[in-house]
Protein backbone atom coordinates (compact mmCIF):
# COMPACT_ATOMS: atom_id res chain seq x y z
CA UNK A 1 0.00 0.00 0.00
CA UNK A 2 2.82 2.42 0.89
CA UNK A 3 4.47 1.86 -2.51
CA UNK A 4 1.17 2.59 -4.24
CA UNK A 5 0.74 5.98 -2.61
CA UNK A 6 4.42 6.81 -3.04
CA UNK A 7 4.03 6.23 -6.78
CA UNK A 8 0.81 8.22 -6.89
CA UNK A 9 2.13 11.19 -4.91
CA UNK A 10 5.13 11.45 -7.21
CA UNK A 11 2.75 12.67 -9.93
CA UNK A 12 -0.42 13.91 -8.21
CA UNK A 13 -1.37 16.15 -5.31
CA UNK A 14 -3.93 13.70 -3.98
CA UNK A 15 -5.34 16.07 -1.32
CA UNK A 16 -7.56 17.62 -3.98
CA UNK A 17 -9.10 14.29 -5.03
CA UNK A 18 -11.64 11.85 -3.69
CA UNK A 19 -10.12 8.38 -3.24
CA UNK A 20 -12.30 5.41 -4.19
CA UNK A 21 -11.63 1.70 -3.71
CA UNK A 22 -14.50 -0.30 -5.25
CA UNK A 23 -13.31 -3.66 -3.85
CA UNK A 24 -11.85 -2.47 -0.56
CA UNK A 25 -11.88 -5.68 1.49
CA UNK A 26 -10.10 -4.85 4.75
CA UNK A 27 -9.72 -1.20 3.64
CA UNK A 28 -5.94 -1.47 3.43
CA UNK A 29 -5.82 1.24 0.76
CA UNK A 30 -8.05 3.58 2.76
CA UNK A 31 -6.08 3.63 6.02
CA UNK A 32 -4.18 6.81 5.17
CA UNK A 33 -5.40 10.15 6.54
CA UNK A 34 -7.33 11.81 3.71
CA UNK A 35 -10.20 14.35 3.61
CA UNK A 36 -12.47 12.17 1.43
CA UNK A 37 -12.08 8.46 0.89
CA UNK A 38 -14.76 5.94 -0.05
CA UNK A 39 -14.67 2.15 0.19
CA UNK A 40 -17.13 -0.34 -1.25
CA UNK A 41 -17.32 -4.11 -1.49
CA UNK A 42 -19.78 -6.94 -2.08
CA UNK A 43 -18.86 -8.53 1.26
CA UNK A 44 -21.20 -7.33 4.02
CA UNK A 45 -18.52 -8.09 6.62
CA UNK A 46 -16.22 -5.36 5.27
CA UNK A 47 -18.10 -2.53 6.95
CA UNK A 48 -18.07 -0.54 3.73
CA UNK A 49 -20.69 0.49 1.19
CA UNK A 50 -22.19 -2.74 -0.09
CA UNK A 51 -21.99 -2.23 -3.85
CA UNK A 52 -21.31 -4.58 -6.74
CA UNK A 53 -18.71 -2.64 -8.73
CA UNK A 54 -19.29 -4.76 -11.84
CA UNK A 55 -23.03 -4.16 -12.24
CA UNK A 56 -24.11 -0.84 -13.73
CA UNK A 57 -21.06 1.06 -12.44
CA UNK A 58 -21.64 4.79 -12.07
CA UNK A 59 -20.40 7.55 -9.81
CA UNK A 60 -23.74 8.21 -8.17
CA UNK A 61 -23.67 4.69 -6.68
CA UNK A 62 -20.85 5.94 -4.46
CA UNK A 63 -22.20 9.44 -3.83
CA UNK A 64 -19.62 10.99 -6.15
CA UNK A 65 -20.64 13.85 -8.46
CA UNK A 66 -19.75 13.86 -12.15
CA UNK A 67 -17.35 16.80 -11.83
CA UNK A 68 -15.68 15.60 -8.61
CA UNK A 69 -11.90 15.02 -9.02
CA UNK A 70 -11.51 11.27 -8.53
CA UNK A 71 -8.70 8.75 -8.09
CA UNK A 72 -9.40 5.02 -7.98
CA UNK A 73 -7.00 3.00 -5.82
CA UNK A 74 -6.77 -0.57 -4.59
CA UNK A 75 -5.96 -4.17 -5.29
CA UNK A 76 -9.01 -5.51 -7.15
CA UNK A 77 -9.57 -9.27 -7.12
CA UNK A 78 -8.17 -11.29 -9.98
CA UNK A 79 -8.03 -14.95 -10.86
CA UNK A 80 -5.21 -16.15 -8.60
CA UNK A 81 -4.32 -16.28 -4.92
CA UNK A 82 -2.30 -13.07 -4.60
CA UNK A 83 -5.14 -10.57 -4.54
CA UNK A 84 -4.55 -10.33 -0.82
CA UNK A 85 -7.38 -7.98 -0.02
CA UNK A 86 -10.03 -10.06 -1.76
CA UNK A 87 -8.99 -13.68 -1.31
CA UNK A 88 -12.34 -14.21 0.40
CA UNK A 89 -14.05 -13.82 -2.96
CA UNK A 90 -12.68 -17.27 -3.84
CA UNK A 91 -13.39 -18.74 -0.42
CA UNK A 92 -17.02 -17.69 -0.02
CA UNK A 93 -19.99 -18.51 -2.19
CA UNK A 94 -20.35 -15.03 -3.62
CA UNK A 95 -22.74 -14.84 -6.54
CA UNK A 96 -22.75 -11.49 -8.24
CA UNK A 97 -23.81 -10.00 -11.52
CA UNK A 98 -21.30 -8.73 -14.09
CA UNK A 99 -22.40 -6.46 -16.94
CA UNK A 100 -21.91 -8.05 -20.35
CA UNK A 101 -19.49 -5.37 -21.55
CA UNK A 102 -17.33 -5.95 -18.45
CA UNK A 103 -17.18 -9.74 -18.58
CA UNK A 104 -13.75 -11.28 -19.05
CA UNK A 105 -11.95 -14.55 -18.37
CA UNK A 106 -10.15 -12.72 -15.57
CA UNK A 107 -12.03 -10.83 -12.87
CA UNK A 108 -9.28 -8.22 -12.60
CA UNK A 109 -9.73 -7.20 -16.22
CA UNK A 110 -13.45 -6.73 -15.54
CA UNK A 111 -12.56 -4.37 -12.70
CA UNK A 112 -10.18 -2.33 -14.84
CA UNK A 113 -12.91 -1.88 -17.44
CA UNK A 114 -15.36 -0.84 -14.74
CA UNK A 115 -12.92 1.85 -13.58
CA UNK A 116 -12.90 3.41 -17.04
CA UNK A 117 -16.69 3.86 -16.90
CA UNK A 118 -16.34 5.96 -13.71
CA UNK A 119 -13.94 8.31 -15.56
CA UNK A 120 -11.46 9.04 -12.74
CA UNK A 121 -8.56 11.39 -13.41
CA UNK A 122 -6.12 8.71 -12.25
CA UNK A 123 -6.16 5.01 -11.46
CA UNK A 124 -3.47 3.53 -9.19
CA UNK A 125 -3.94 -0.18 -8.57
CA UNK A 126 -2.13 -3.50 -8.28
CA UNK A 127 -2.71 -6.15 -10.92
CA UNK A 128 -0.77 -8.94 -12.66
CA UNK A 129 1.86 -7.59 -15.04
CA UNK A 130 0.57 -10.12 -17.57
CA UNK A 131 -2.50 -7.92 -18.20
CA UNK A 132 -0.19 -5.51 -20.00
CA UNK A 133 2.73 -7.51 -21.35
CA UNK A 134 0.78 -10.45 -22.82
CA UNK A 135 -0.77 -9.15 -26.01
CA UNK A 136 -3.84 -11.41 -25.81
CA UNK A 137 -4.60 -10.06 -22.33
CA UNK A 138 -3.94 -6.49 -23.40
CA UNK A 139 -6.50 -6.80 -26.21
CA UNK A 140 -9.15 -7.75 -23.63
CA UNK A 141 -8.61 -4.36 -21.99
CA UNK A 142 -10.13 -2.45 -24.92
CA UNK A 143 -12.64 -0.42 -22.89
CA UNK A 144 -9.82 0.47 -20.49
CA UNK A 145 -6.86 0.99 -22.84
CA UNK A 146 -8.89 3.23 -25.15
CA UNK A 147 -9.36 5.74 -22.33
CA UNK A 148 -6.29 5.35 -20.10
CA UNK A 149 -2.54 5.23 -20.56
CA UNK A 150 0.21 3.92 -18.31
CA UNK A 151 1.98 6.85 -16.65
CA UNK A 152 4.26 5.12 -14.14
CA UNK A 153 4.73 1.69 -12.63
CA UNK A 154 6.68 -0.53 -10.24
CA UNK A 155 6.96 -4.28 -10.75
CA UNK A 156 6.95 -6.31 -7.54
CA UNK A 157 6.95 -10.02 -6.72
CA UNK A 158 3.78 -11.89 -5.80
CA UNK A 159 5.87 -13.34 -2.95
CA UNK A 160 5.13 -10.10 -1.12
CA UNK A 161 1.55 -11.34 -0.73
CA UNK A 162 1.52 -15.13 -0.98
CA UNK A 163 3.63 -18.29 -0.82
CA UNK A 164 2.19 -19.70 -4.04
CA UNK A 165 4.02 -19.73 -7.38
CA UNK A 166 5.90 -16.48 -7.92
CA UNK A 167 4.95 -14.13 -10.73
CA UNK A 168 5.20 -10.38 -11.41
CA UNK A 169 2.63 -7.90 -10.16
CA UNK A 170 2.62 -4.28 -11.24
CA UNK A 171 1.70 -1.27 -9.16
CA UNK A 172 0.37 0.74 -12.09
CA UNK A 173 -0.54 4.42 -12.31
CA UNK A 174 -2.82 5.34 -15.21
CA UNK A 175 -3.97 8.73 -16.43
CA UNK A 176 -6.58 9.75 -18.98
CA UNK A 177 -5.47 9.02 -22.54
CA UNK A 178 -5.09 5.90 -24.63
CA UNK A 179 -2.42 3.30 -25.22
CA UNK A 180 -1.66 0.49 -27.62
CA UNK A 181 0.52 -2.59 -27.30
CA UNK A 182 3.45 -0.82 -28.96
CA UNK A 183 3.40 1.63 -26.04
CA UNK A 184 3.65 -1.24 -23.58
CA UNK A 185 6.53 -2.82 -25.50
CA UNK A 186 8.41 0.48 -25.30
CA UNK A 187 7.59 1.16 -21.65
CA UNK A 188 10.48 0.86 -19.21
CA UNK A 189 9.15 -0.88 -16.09
CA UNK A 190 11.13 -0.24 -12.90
CA UNK A 191 11.32 -3.31 -10.63
CA UNK A 192 11.76 -3.84 -6.91
CA UNK A 193 15.17 -5.37 -7.71
CA UNK A 194 16.52 -1.97 -8.71
CA UNK A 195 16.50 -2.96 -12.38
CA UNK A 196 14.20 -2.20 -15.30
CA UNK A 197 12.29 -4.36 -17.75
CA UNK A 198 11.49 -3.36 -21.34
CA UNK A 199 9.93 -5.83 -23.75
CA UNK A 200 11.64 -4.24 -26.74
CA UNK A 201 15.05 -5.02 -25.24
CA UNK A 202 14.69 -8.70 -26.15
CA UNK A 203 13.91 -11.10 -28.98
CA UNK A 204 11.62 -14.06 -28.39
CA UNK A 205 11.48 -17.71 -29.41
CA UNK A 206 7.98 -17.31 -30.87
CA UNK A 207 9.60 -15.47 -33.77
CA UNK A 208 11.32 -18.71 -34.77
CA UNK A 209 9.15 -21.69 -33.74
CA UNK A 210 5.59 -22.79 -33.16
CA UNK A 211 4.54 -22.75 -29.50
CA UNK A 212 1.21 -24.51 -29.92
CA UNK A 213 -0.10 -27.62 -31.75
CA UNK A 214 0.83 -27.33 -35.42
CA UNK A 215 0.04 -30.65 -37.10
CA UNK A 216 -1.23 -28.96 -40.27
CA UNK A 217 1.97 -26.92 -40.68
CA UNK A 218 4.60 -29.66 -40.25
CA UNK A 219 5.03 -32.48 -42.74
CA UNK A 220 8.17 -34.45 -41.91
CA UNK A 221 8.21 -34.60 -38.12
CA UNK A 222 11.39 -35.43 -36.16
CA UNK A 223 10.02 -35.04 -32.64
CA UNK A 224 7.35 -33.69 -30.34
CA UNK A 225 7.33 -30.90 -27.79
CA UNK A 226 5.06 -29.79 -24.99
CA UNK A 227 3.02 -26.65 -25.85
CA UNK A 228 4.53 -23.43 -24.52
CA UNK A 229 3.11 -20.29 -22.95
CA UNK A 230 5.60 -18.26 -20.97
CA UNK A 231 8.74 -18.76 -18.90
CA UNK A 232 6.81 -19.60 -15.72
CA UNK A 233 4.88 -22.29 -17.59
CA UNK A 234 8.14 -23.68 -18.97
CA UNK A 235 9.43 -24.12 -15.41
CA UNK A 236 6.45 -26.37 -14.60
CA UNK A 237 6.03 -28.28 -17.85
CA UNK A 238 7.90 -30.86 -19.88
CA UNK A 239 9.91 -30.07 -23.00
CA UNK A 240 10.45 -32.99 -25.43
CA UNK A 241 7.77 -35.69 -25.52
CA UNK A 242 8.41 -39.39 -26.13
CA UNK A 243 5.21 -39.93 -28.09
CA UNK A 244 2.83 -37.86 -30.21
CA UNK A 245 -0.40 -36.49 -28.83
CA UNK A 246 -3.19 -34.29 -30.09
CA UNK A 247 -1.80 -31.32 -28.16
CA UNK A 248 1.87 -31.83 -29.01
CA UNK A 249 3.93 -29.37 -31.01
CA UNK A 250 5.43 -31.17 -33.99
CA UNK A 251 9.09 -30.45 -34.70
CA UNK A 252 10.56 -30.18 -38.19
CA UNK A 253 14.27 -30.81 -38.74
CA UNK A 254 15.08 -27.17 -39.48
CA UNK A 255 13.49 -26.05 -36.19
CA UNK A 256 14.93 -28.79 -33.98
CA UNK A 257 17.83 -26.65 -32.80
CA UNK A 258 15.45 -24.04 -31.40
CA UNK A 259 13.54 -26.63 -29.40
CA UNK A 260 16.86 -27.85 -28.04
CA UNK A 261 17.52 -24.24 -27.05
CA UNK A 262 14.21 -24.15 -25.17
CA UNK A 263 15.10 -27.40 -23.40
CA UNK A 264 18.29 -25.83 -22.06
CA UNK A 265 16.54 -22.54 -21.29
CA UNK A 266 14.31 -24.50 -18.91
CA UNK A 267 17.42 -25.40 -16.87
CA UNK A 268 18.29 -21.76 -16.20
CA UNK A 269 14.73 -20.42 -15.95
CA UNK A 270 14.60 -20.73 -12.12
CA UNK A 271 17.81 -18.71 -11.89
CA UNK A 272 16.61 -15.56 -13.65
CA UNK A 273 14.57 -12.83 -11.91
CA UNK A 274 10.87 -13.43 -11.28
CA UNK A 275 9.87 -10.44 -13.43
CA UNK A 276 10.71 -12.36 -16.62
CA UNK A 277 8.16 -15.04 -15.68
CA UNK A 278 5.30 -13.90 -17.91
CA UNK A 279 7.48 -13.22 -20.94
CA UNK A 280 7.96 -15.56 -23.84
CA UNK A 281 11.25 -17.49 -23.88
CA UNK A 282 14.03 -15.02 -24.64
CA UNK A 283 16.72 -15.55 -27.27
CA UNK A 284 19.52 -13.62 -28.94
CA UNK A 285 19.17 -15.39 -32.27
CA UNK A 286 22.34 -14.02 -33.85
CA UNK A 287 24.49 -14.87 -30.83
CA UNK A 288 22.88 -18.31 -30.51
CA UNK A 289 23.39 -19.32 -34.14
CA UNK A 290 26.99 -18.15 -33.94
CA UNK A 291 27.77 -20.68 -31.17
CA UNK A 292 25.02 -23.24 -31.73
CA UNK A 293 27.31 -26.29 -31.92
CA UNK A 294 29.17 -25.36 -28.74
CA UNK A 295 25.88 -24.39 -27.08
CA UNK A 296 24.48 -27.89 -27.54
CA UNK A 297 27.65 -29.70 -26.44
CA UNK A 298 29.22 -27.55 -23.74
CA UNK A 299 27.51 -26.45 -20.51
CA UNK A 300 30.10 -23.68 -20.05
CA UNK A 301 29.28 -22.23 -23.47
CA UNK A 302 25.60 -22.21 -22.58
CA UNK A 303 26.30 -20.52 -19.25
CA UNK A 304 28.35 -17.76 -20.88
CA UNK A 305 25.62 -17.20 -23.46
CA UNK A 306 22.91 -16.89 -20.81
CA UNK A 307 25.06 -14.61 -18.65
CA UNK A 308 25.36 -12.21 -21.59
CA UNK A 309 21.67 -12.57 -22.46
CA UNK A 310 20.62 -11.48 -18.96
CA UNK A 311 23.48 -9.10 -18.31
CA UNK A 312 22.47 -6.36 -15.87
CA UNK A 313 19.82 -8.51 -14.18
CA UNK A 314 20.30 -10.28 -10.81
CA UNK A 315 20.60 -13.93 -11.87
CA UNK A 316 21.71 -16.89 -9.78
CA UNK A 317 23.98 -18.56 -12.30
CA UNK A 318 26.77 -20.79 -10.92
Question: What positions do the PLM features span?
Answer:
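Conserved S-adenosyl-L-methionine
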Residues: 1-71, 130
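Mobile active-site "lid"/loop adjacent to the S-adenosyl-L-methionine
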Residues: 82-104
Amino acid sequence: MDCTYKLLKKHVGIENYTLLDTACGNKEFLKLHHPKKIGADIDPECGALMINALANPKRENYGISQDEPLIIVGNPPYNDRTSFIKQDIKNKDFIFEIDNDLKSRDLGISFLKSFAILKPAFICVLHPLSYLIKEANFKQLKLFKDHYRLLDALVVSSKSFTKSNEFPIVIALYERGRMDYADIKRFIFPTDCGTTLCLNDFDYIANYVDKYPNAKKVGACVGYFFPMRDINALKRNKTFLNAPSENAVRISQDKLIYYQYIHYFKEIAPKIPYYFGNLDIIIDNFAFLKIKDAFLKDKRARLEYFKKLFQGHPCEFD
